[in-house]
Design a protein with these regions (language model features):
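Hydrophobic helix-and-loop "lid/oligomerization" segment in the mid-to-C-terminal part
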Residues: 3-5, 9-101
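Secreted, periplasmic, or luminal enzymes acting at the cell surface/secretory milieu
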Residues: 2, 6-22, 88-180
Length: 180
């Protein structure tokens, strides 16, 4: 089931307004999406990766939202900040802007044939996800690999400009969202 059909099943009527594809550099649907978002009470944006972008042999050098999705998210936020962001992805993504601006983020991963139904049940409150992540999300791709049982370095914690330290100079050492 698509996200659209799942929402229709849970609500019992059509509740999905637009499905636009933004996994490329094409911005032709931006204005239509902004128009729909302007008149909506809540905007549910399903962003992330499609199945062929993840899995064995599908490495990416950038963990941001693919294509122009980040730009679309920011444009929609300008006209209606009441957004629920549903992430559909097969790996952790770097989403610092979304974490700072979007009031609700649901990690859906890439589920199966009942994806739409499962996500709709979460969004409409019929199911409460436990909120545990099977993997850590980095703040920035430069933190990778980042994982829950990473050993500490031998570098000292104290910050002294003449001493090496055990953290990054431009971002916190901790993950954006930790494992578990």
């Amino acid at each position: 089931l698509t996200f659209e059909k799942g929402a229709d099943l849970v609500v019992g009527k059509q509740s999905f307004t637009e499905e636009l594809v933004f996994n490329t550099t094409d911005k032709s649907g931006f204005e239509a999406a902004k128009k729909v978002a302007t008149n909506a009470d809540v905007v549910v944006m399903v962003l992330g990766e499609v199945g062929f972008q993840t899995g064995e042999g599908r490495s990416r050098t950038n963990l941001d939202l693919p294509g122009v999705q980040q730009e679309l998210l920011e444009e929609i936020y300008k006209v209606n900040p009441n957004i629920v962001l549903v992430l559909n992805n097969g790996r952790p993504l770097t989403i610092p802007w979304a974490v700072e601006h979007i009031p609700a983020i649901v990690e859906a991963w890439q589920l199966g044939t009942q994806t739409g139904n499962a996500v709709a049940q979460v969004l409409y409150g019929d199911y409460n996800p436990i909120g545990k992540l099977p993997i850590s999300f980095p703040r920035n791709v430069g933190q990778c690999p980042i994982y829950y049982n990473n050993y500490n370095t031998g570098r000292p914690e104290n910050v002294d400009k003449n001493v090496f330290w055990s953290h990054y100079t431009d971002v916190e050492k901790t993950p954006l969202y930790p494992f578990g």
